[in-house]
């Protein structure tokens, strides 16, 4: 029997077995079975929600079997989807990272939440009609002053939706005072999480999830995010990393005088209309919203344009 008392050693063992079955669709064994086959003895620990991001960073959160299962899912059964999401993240993270850098009281790790929410697709649409990188439903978008009319849907706007997400996350944290509940509320709604908490006083997020007090999606939301953060933090050690392209995107925020069309902008900047739409997916048609005197767009800089072309 292999006895492991160091949390980081536990993590490395978990990754070894996860990577072993990554992308192998013919291996139907569950992650816990693979671990059991290796006869690894993991020390027990009580998870608290005192500092979610610290527990991810120092890997103590690995003691949660829910997190272990989600690492297995992302590096095993959903391996192709995970690779795609991390590939997309390279394209859009530079655009949202700058916004988070201005928010000193928000954990920087939150820039990776769109991997969970949308697979980092700014045009993603859920079954509940939530849209964009940050997956806002229309009611929440309206509360956050994101416009949706015949010209734009700002839920798909990379910068504006990110600024709205920052406001929303700050609000949720101010309500719940810890990130497990704030993240659960981002998924299930603040009212829903308050209701579950009021019916089960004194229980933390992990206890509520373990006791099936949350609906399944909300119970899995925090473990899934933790798993993705761990993968991201150790990305170079994964089999995902060699599959990612070397492209690095940098952007300019350009101000356009209206009236203007995407066709006009394409000619002015020497970038295809397709690429303009890719970085400004909020635009519904060819016409820039005419009710603004000027309008800001996200355009790759000259070096990025050269790589794209």
PLM regions with names:
Residues 128-149, 162-165, 193-196:
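Substrate-binding/active-site groove segments that recognize
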Residues 261-290:
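LysM (lysin motif) carbohydrate-binding repeats in extracellular/periplasmic proteins that recognize
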Residues 106-122, 182-187, 276-280:
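Short, functionally critical alpha-helical segments immediately adjacent to catalytic or ligand/cofactor-binding
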Residues 1-29:
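Bacterial Sec-dependent N-terminal signal peptides
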Residues 243-270:
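Primarily a LysM-type cell-wall glycan-binding module
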Residues 21-104:
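An acidic, Gly/Ser/Thr/Pro-rich helix-cap/linker signature
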Residues 119-127, 143, 172-175, 190-202, ...:
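Secretory-pathway/luminal and periplasmic proteins that interact with or process carbohydrate-rich
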Residues 279-309:
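Extracellular LysM carbohydrate-binding repeats and other cell-envelope/extracellular binding modules
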């Amino acid at each position: 029997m292999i006895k492991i008392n160091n949390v980081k050693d536990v993590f490395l063992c978990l990754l070894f077995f996860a990577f072993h079955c990554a992308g192998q669709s013919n291996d139907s064994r569950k992650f816990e079975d693979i671990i059991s086959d290796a006869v690894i003895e993991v020390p027990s620990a009580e998870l608290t929600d005192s500092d979610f991001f610290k527990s991810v960073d120092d890997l103590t959160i690995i003691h949660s079997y829910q997190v272990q299962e989600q690492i297995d899912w992302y590096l095993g059964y959903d391996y192709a989807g995970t690779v795609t999401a991390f590939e997309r993240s390279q394209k859009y993270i530079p655009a949202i990272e700058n916004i988070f850098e201005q928010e000193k009281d928000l954990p920087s790790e939150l820039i990776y939440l769109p991997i969970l929410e949308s697979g980092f697709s700014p045009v993603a649409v859920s079954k509940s009609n939530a849209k964009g990188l940050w997956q806002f439903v229309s009611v929440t978008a309206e509360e956050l002053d994101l416009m949706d009319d015949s010209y734009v849907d700002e839920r798909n706007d990379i910068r504006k939706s990110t600024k709205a997400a920052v406001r929303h996350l700050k609000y949720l944290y101010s309500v719940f005072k810890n990130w497990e509940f704030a993240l659960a509320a981002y998924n299930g709604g603040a009212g829903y999480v308050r209701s579950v908490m009021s019916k089960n006083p004194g229980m933390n997020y992990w206890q509520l999830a373990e006791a099936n007090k949350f609906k399944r999606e909300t119970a899995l939301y925090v473990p899934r995010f933790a798993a993705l953060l761990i993968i991201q933090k150790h990305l170079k050690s994964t089999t995902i990393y060699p599959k990612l392209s070397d492209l690095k995107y940098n952007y300019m925020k350009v101000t356009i005088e209206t009236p203007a069309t995407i066709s006009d902008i394409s000619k002015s900047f020497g970038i295809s209309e397709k690429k303009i739409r890719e970085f400004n997916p909020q635009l519904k048609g060819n016409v820039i919203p005419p009710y603004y005197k000027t309008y800001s767009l996200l355009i790759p800089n000259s070096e990025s344009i050269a790589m794209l072309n």
